[in-house]
Amino acid sequence: MAHRLIYQVVVTGTQVFAKAFTQAYKQAATAQAASKTSKSAASKFGGLQLDEACKILDVDETALDKVVAELNKKHKLEDIAESESVLAQIDKKFTHLYTVNSEHKSGSFYLQSKVYRAMERIRGELELDPLPKPEIEEPKKKEEEKK
């Protein structure tokens, strides 16, 4: 009788442990698959997440989501005009931050790179053309000023 009771306890404990182990394994597998997709999207655009890129360029994520939706629809002219104004504001912020952080103006190449990668990430999200680097006016050298 005692053997039967011990046997039932061992079998029941093994079943509970096996079920818990398989559920934990399934959860770990789905979490790993989800992290791979988010990491691949981030690595495609310089390692920046979209929310981080929006923070760098001071862009409202909801406005960006509206632009993406309108670019996908493209049926109302007034909505497209609103989207273009948001894109123009983003371009203006990018140009300003990129120029301010240029090495010629005692800026930081690191910050300039962050600004560039943020804009690259946003343009990638909007599926726009690749981003050209803006022209920066270089300061005149002392030799040119003497002539």
Swiss-Prot record:
GO molecular function, one term: protein domain specific binding
Keyword Membrane included in the entry's annotation: yes
Coiled coil: none
UniProtKB keywords: Membrane, Mitochondrion, Mitochondrion inner membrane, Protein transport, Translocation, Transport
Compartments reported by the entry: Mitochondrion inner membrane
Keyword Protein transport set for record: yes
UniProt region (Disordered), positions on chain: 128-147
Record membrane topology: Peripheral membrane protein
A biological process term (GO) from this entry: protein import into mitochondrial matrix
Residues covered by region (J-like): 52-127
Pfam family, one: Pam16
A cellular-component GO term for this protein: PAM complex, Tim23 associated import motor
Function: Essential component of the PAM complex, a complex required for the translocation of transit peptide-containing proteins from the inner membrane into the mitochondrial matrix in an ATP-dependent manner. In the complex, it is required to regulate activity of mtHSP70 (SSC1) via its interaction with PAM18/TIM14. May act by positioning PAM18/TIM14 in juxtaposition to mtHSP70 at the translocon to maximize ATPase stimulation.
Record's subunit section: Heterodimer with PAM18. Component of the PAM complex, at least composed of mtHsp70, MGE1, TIM44, PAM16, PAM17 and PAM18.
Protein family membership: Belongs to the TIM16/PAM16 family.
Domain notes: The J-like region, although related to the J domain does not stimulate ATPase activity of mtHSP70. It nevertheless mediates the heterodimerization with the J domain of PAM18 and is therefore essential for PAM complex function.
Name by which UniProt lists this protein: Mitochondrial import inner membrane translocase subunit TIM16
Organism: Yarrowia lipolytica (strain CLIB 122 / E 150) (Yeast)
Gene behind this protein: PAM16
